[in-house]
Design a protein with these regions (language model features):
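Short, polar/flexible loop-turn hinges at active-site or ligand-entry regions and domain interfaces
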Residues: 1, 17-21, 40-49, 89-90
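Transmembrane helix-loop-helix
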Residues: 1-17
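Hydrophobic alpha-helical cores of multi-pass transmembrane domains in eukaryotic membrane proteins
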Residues: 2-6, 27, 31-35, 153, ...
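Conserved cytochrome P450 catalytic core segment spanning the I/J/K helices
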Residues: 18, 22, 32, 70-71, ...
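Short His/Asp/Glu-rich catalytic/ion-coordination signatures at enzyme active sites or charged loops
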Residues: 78-91
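Cytochrome P450 catalytic-core helices
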Residues: 163-181, 186-188
C-alpha cells in the first residue's frame, strides 16, 4: 500500500516539472490517503473532493492549534468561555465538528454495508466488536462504541498525518540543503536497488547510509 502511494505521489510531483514548488502542502496527500485506506478501505485519487476536503480541514485545524492564544488557553481554558469568538474557539469547534461529521458519515456507510464475515478495514472490525459487545460498561458498547470509534478515527488522523508529513518535509529540506548527502543516498539506492525498484522495509538492512540519514 505504501509503495502504491509512493508511485502516485511521484507521478504528482512529476507534473510540476523541474521548477520550484511548495511541497509542504502536498506531502499530506499520500499520508492521509494511506490512513484512509487502512481505516475506511477507500483509495482516493489526489483530486478527489472527499480527500481534498479532509486535507483542507486538517490543515486548518493544525494552523489554528499552533496560534499563541491557543497555547495560552491550554494554561487557562476557562478564558475561552468568556471570549470564544475573539479567541477563535467557535471556529475551532466548527472545524472539529466538520472533521467528525466526515468520520461519522463513513461509519454510517460502513454500518449499512457491513458483512461480519468479510471485514474490509479498521471501521468494519470496530463495528463488529460493537455488535458483539453486551457489557454496558465496555467502551465498545452501543452508541458509546460508535462515539469512541469516531474519536479514534480523529485521533489517528491528527496523530498520524501532520507528524509524518512534517518529518518527511524536513527530510527533503535536509537533502536540498545538503546535495552531497543527497548524491550519496541516491548512489546507494541505485547500487542496491537499481534504477527502478521501489524500496521496501526488507531492503532496509542493505541501505545503511540511507537509513542513517532518514
Amino acid at each position: 500500500m505504501i509503495q502504491e502511494e509512493l508511485i502516485k505521489f511521484r507521478a504528482l510531483l512529476e507534473t510540476y516539472g523541474e521548477g520550484p514548488f511548495d511541497i509542504a502542502g502536498k506531502m499530506n496527500l499520500p499520508i492521509i490517503n494511506a490512513l484512509w485506506r487502512v481505516t475506511a478501505g477507500e483509495d482516493f485519487e489526489y483530486n478527489n473532493p472527499v480527500l481534498v476536503d479532509l486535507l483542507t480541514r486538517m490543515t486548518e485545524w493544525f494552523k489554528r492549534v499552533g496560534r499563541p492564544e491557543v497555547i495560552f488557553l491550554f494554561a487557562f481554558p476557562w478564558i475561552a468561555k468568556l471570549w470564544p469568538s475573539f479567541l477563535g474557539r467557535d471556529e475551532d469547534i466548527k472545524i472539529n465538528k466538520d472533521i467528525m461529521n466526515m468520520m461519522r458519515k463513513s461509519i454510517k456507510n460502513h454500518k449499512e454495508t457491513l458483512d461480519t464475515n468479510e471485514p474490509r478495514d479498521y471501521i468494519d472490525k470496530y463495528l463488529i466488536e460493537i455488535q458483539n459487545t453486551k457489557d454496558p460498561n465496555s467502551s465498545f458498547y452501543g452508541e458509546k462504541g460508535i462515539n469512541n470509534l469516531a474519536a479514534n478515527l480523529l485521533d489517528l488522523f491528527i496523530a498520524g498525518s501532520e507528524t509524518t508529513s512534517t518529518t518527511l518535509t524536513w527530510a527533503i529540506l535536509y537533502m536540498v540543503r545538503n546535495p552531497d548527502v543527497q548524491d550519496k543516498v541516491q548512489k546507494e539506492l541505485d547500487t542496491v536497488l537499481g534504477k527502478y525498484k521501489i524500496p521496501s522495509l526488507s531492503d532496509k538492512p542493505s541501505l545503511p547510509y540511507t537509513d542513517v540519514k532518514y
